A protein has these predicted regions:
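Intrinsically disordered, low-complexity Ser/Thr/Pro/Gly-rich interaction regions
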Residues: 280-441
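Generic alpha-helical structural element
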Residues: 21, 170, 211, 275-279, ...
Length: 452
């Protein structure tokens, strides 16, 4: 028998009194720091949707923090602005899950922290709200599957799963009522601003900022749903599994309610991975491999650079028409060519005139992109985003480099070091130290106060 929506929510509320595992503390701290740094950079530089999302927003000295701005805004506006900016660089985390992968922190962190700023919530309450939301997002994603974005459909996983999960997390900051939490989930899931993937389609080629705005709307919607529930508004009793509900509407044949049975306390939050490079996650392993090969061979020594990635990434990240920064971030040919030619992959490589660099575009012609069913199967079974990159001189193999992801083989110390470097590149050394301090001590009220 399928678990009821009420019981599913009740199980998540048990996290409010459970001992917080060390990995939950570490993951939530890192995701908050990462999200804030990315959003702050995008806002300060007016990138993507952050260039104009403040239209009709009134800033003031009160309210919730807008990352990258001195002023504050009303909580709903702050959630929208921070969600939009957090998405703009495509530098955000990804849930590594073979059943369904997508972004979540870009919705959950802006919504939860905007409310925490309004309510002066404790650091422990915020950490628990994030735990609830991130665990719920995994459950919703697994139950949904990925047919919602296949066979011509284009619903974004982030819009469908992260918003209801964030609403559930926000509800726990308002009170610990099961009725409030279920209502927040139900209102959010039943009234979703369901973002579409059209902007990122190589066939469409628009690469437009509605991608960013969609995340902002989701963060705002999640918080708004929780506030309405806190005020007494109600939603369906079975918004997720019920007739004409969320799964029935978006499942598209891949829905499986058995995935909702996993206890939230058993959800592995370490499946959320930050990005090492400012491009789509499907590009990450190929970028790392291309950098290494670029340090071994000059561009004129290589006649062909063969990229093998999972077949779905080869299709969705295939564009060679690089009209703007977003197209560059969603192009395996550009990302790999840039990494090889420049022997790096940093923010500046995807901005301004760098997007039109003749040396990079000349090397794009040497990129051969192949989708591998073998690598797709590895992704589906293990959740990884592998890549094999081979440099050729004529028909002779010069070298081949393979990785399962951007952090493949890194030690804990290396992982921490590159994360610190990422934060510094986004917000400068001083702000990076503040964010790093929070990421290491997210249960500290004093650390939280520096952010909200």
């Amino acid at each position: 028998m399928t678990i009821s929506d009420r019981e599913w929510v009740a199980r998540h509320l048990q996290l409010l009194t459970a001992e917080i595992p060390s990995d939950v503390v570490a993951v939530t701290g890192r995701l908050v720091a990462d999200t804030i740094a990315i959003a702050g950079y995008a806002r300060a530089h007016g990138i993507g949707g952050a260039a104009f999302d403040a239209a009709s927003v009134q800033f003031s000295g009160q309210g919730s923090s807008v990352w990258g701005e001195e002023a504050k805004a009303a909580p709903l506006d702050a959630a929208f602005l921070n969600g939009t900016a957090a998405e703009a660089l495509d530098f955000q985390e990804v849930l590594i899950n073979g059943r369904n992968n997508g972004h979540a922190a870009v919705v959950i962190v802006p919504a939860v922290l905007a409310l925490a700023g309004q309510l002066s919530s404790s650091a422990e309450a915020v950490t628990r709200a994030l735990w609830v939301a991130l665990a719920a997002n995994i459950g919703l994603g697994e139950a949904l599957g990925r047919a919602h974005r296949a066979n011509g459909l284009g619903f974004r996983t982030t819009s469908l799963t992260a918003a209801p999960a964030a609403a559930l997390g926000c509800a726990t900051l308002i009170n610990n009522s099961l009725d409030t939490a279920l209502a927040a989930l139900g209102i959010c899931a039943s009234t979703l601003p369901a973002g579409l993937l059209s902007a990122m389609s190589p066939k469409m080629g628009s690469y437009s900022p509605d991608k960013d705005l969609s995340v902002g709307f989701s963060a705002r919607h999640a918080l708004h749903s929780a506030l309405l529930a806190g005020a007494g508004a109600t939603g369906p009793e079975a918004p997720i599994t019920g007739d004409k509900g969320w799964l029935a509407s978006y499942g598209a044949g891949s829905a499986d309610t058995s995935y909702l049975e996993t206890p939230p306390s058993e959800r592995d939050l370490t499946a959320y991975s930050i990005k090492l490079y400012p491009a789509n996650f499907g590009c990450q392993a190929a970028i790392r491999a291309s950098i290494e090969l670029g340090r071994q061979f000059a561009p004129d020594e290589v006649t062909r650079l063969h990229l093998e990635v999972k077949s779905s990434s080869a299709a969705s990240l295939s564009t060679r028409s690089i009209e703007n920064h977003l197209a560059a971030r969603f192009s395996l040919p550009f990302a790999a060519a840039s990494a090889f030619v420049r022997q790096r992959s940093v923010l500046a490589d995807f901005e301004g005139k760098a997007v039109a660099d003749p040396a990079v575009h000349a090397f794009i012609d040497k990129i051969e992109l192949t989708g591998s069913d073998e690598l797709e199967a590895a992704h589906l079974s293990r959740g990884i985003f592998p890549a094999r990159v081979t440099a050729y001189a004529g028909e002779n193999v010069l070298a081949r480099v393979s990785y399962d992801g951007p952090f493949d083989g890194y030690s804990a110390a290396q992982d921490e070091a590159v994360f610190a470097e990422k934060l510094a590149s986004l917000c400068g050394a001083e702000r990076a130290e503040v964010l790093l301090a929070y990421s290491r001590e997210p249960l500290s009220d004093a650390r939280l106060r520096t952010l909200v």
